[in-house]
Swiss-Prot record:
Residues 19-25 form a propeptide. GO terms for biological process: killing of cells of another organism. This is Toxin CfTX-A. It comes from Chironex fleckeri. One of its GO terms (molecular function) is toxin activity. Oligomer.
């Protein structure tokens, strides 16, 4: 193999990844544009939408030239000084614009931008303080917190996308290098520097931490994002596995690197075990994982979850418990094991409740084309009403809608927690009244919401 050719490849890969720069305009023109925005922000009255609009314009201006990064903090501070004018309004407009700006600064400039970021964080703190009185309710705070989460998550997605581009370049490099055969120790050293395993492992570590937190979250949006991050995590882990495998093949061509090759092989096995441990909860769920599970199951409801299952098999995770059905069953409550789901008619309504000592199966559970399940009892399809802690009612309609598209989350105990496509974080349970009506509970309803399908 030509040593100079390898050096060229490594430099090409590094250069390609490090020099994705945007088109730059004349610095004076950009500076003038930013100064106009500063004046516009100084003249803002009580219209928070105008602030967001100005920040969006700033995003365009500041993207044009890295030399303007020092001016970002000035603009942000200008926005901050305008906050005293606000006595009411939609704080999210301001926060959204600021987070957009922060994202632009982070993605546009490779140099230091800590001052600008600090200024944005300080600004958002000011917003929180400003709206902390009567004008700032918990709903608005939740929106702002969600905006922060979305921003951080987007940074992580961008990191994974960058790693994916790196993988494509490096795997092509490795395959090209291995074709020549008879790799020397000097060439091997160059190849080793071209394989960014540390970078991949760092991103995987961040994703793993994110998954560990999200797997037990009771927040619906957080749980849904966690499933997406599991998909990204498994994609990246597979890329790392592929890189290491190809690297081992090259190491085998160098007699002096045989011990090194064995060590790398051991690390490959350790990595696979670590991935299995991270995603094990998917097929061995506890009640604390149920909200996340309600977005993963039914597995065949989306291409993403089907891909997760394929990746899980690649890393040796056993198949999940039964989570699709097609027949007539008894649905037994865990807390009251002699009670089962049944149905009664009340003032023209068909209400699902608990009945004791049901001897024969009567609940029909059937998979829909979209992967969800439909529950039917004596001609009535069960659905959850939209009332607080909704009731399980029956409808004669063939399509009960998303309120009647059920998710069966399999627990490792052998029981199931049941929610709907409409409200994945609300689970079916049997209330402790004399009638034992079937209702839904936000997050974990306890053993009253665990069901065995017989």
């Amino acid at each position: 193999m030509d040593y100079a050719f390898i050096v060229f490849l490594v430099c090409f890969v590094s250069g390609t990844l490090g020099n994705r720069r945007r088109a730059k305009r004349d610095v004076d023109e950009v500076t003038s544009g930013i100064n106009q925005l500063v004046n516009q922000l100084n003249n803002v009255q009580q219209d928070t939408a105008a602030i967001k609009s100005a920040l969006e314009e700033l995003k365009t201006e500041v993207s044009a030239s890295p030399s303007t990064v020092s001016q970002v903090s000035e603009v942000v501070n200008t926005v901050g000084s305008s906050l005293t004018k606000f006595t009411s309004g939609d704080a999210f407009n301001i926060v959204s614009g600021c987070l957009d700006l922060l994202s632009t600064v982070a993605s546009t400039f490779g140099g230091p931008y800590g001052i600008a970021i600090s200024a944005v964080i300080s600004l958002v703190s000011s917003i929180l303080s400003l709206f902390a009185g009567d004008g700032f309710d918990s709903a608005t705070r939740k929106v702002i917190e969600e905006a922060f989460k979305t921003h951080r998550d987007q940074e992580l997605r961008d990191s994974v996308n960058g790693a994916r581009r790196t993988f494509n370049d490096v795997i092509a490099f490795l395959k090209g290098a291995s074709k020549h055969g008879n790799v020397t120790e000097q060439e091997l050293e160059v190849i080793s520097k071209g394989v960014p395993l540390t970078k991949l492992s760092d991103t995987l570590g961040i994703l793993e931490s994110r998954i560990n937190r999200g797997s037990t979250s009771t927040d619906a949006a957080e749980a849904e994002r966690t499933v997406e991050f599991i998909f990204l995590y498994l994609q990246l882990a597979t890329m790392r596995d592929t890189l290491i495998t190809n690297f081992i093949l090259i190491l085998k061509q160098v007699p002096a690197a045989d011990t090194y090759a064995n060590a790398v092989s051991i690390s490959l096995d350790a990595n696979k075990e670590s991935v299995r441990e991270t995603i094990d909860f998917l097929h061995n769920m506890e009640a604390k994982n149920a909200v996340c599970g309600a977005y993963y199951y039914p597995i065949y409801h989306s291409e993403m979850t089907k891909s997760i299952l394929s990746f899980a098999k690649f890393f040796g995770l056993p198949d999940p418990p039964r989570n699709t059905f097609g027949g007539v069953y008894r649905v037994q409550n865990r807390y009251w094991p002699t009670w089962y789901i049944c149905k009664e008619s009340y003032m023209g309504n068909h209400m699902f409740r608990g009945c004791s000592n049901v001897r024969s199966p009567s609940v029909q559970i059937r998979a829909l084309e979209n992967g969800y399940q439909k529950i039917n009892l004596r001609g009535k399809n069960m659905y959850i009403t939209k009332h607080a802690q909704g009731w399980a009612w029956g409808t004669a309609d063939n399509d009960p809608g998303e309120q009647g598209y059920f998710v069966f989350v399999p627990l490792k105990s052998g029981y199931y927690m049941i929610s709907t496509k409409k409200w994945p974080n609300y689970f079916v349970y049997m209330e402790s009244s004399a009638s034992g009506y079937i209702r839904s509970w936000n997050h974990n309803p306890g053993l009253q919401g665990h069901w065995r399908i017989l």
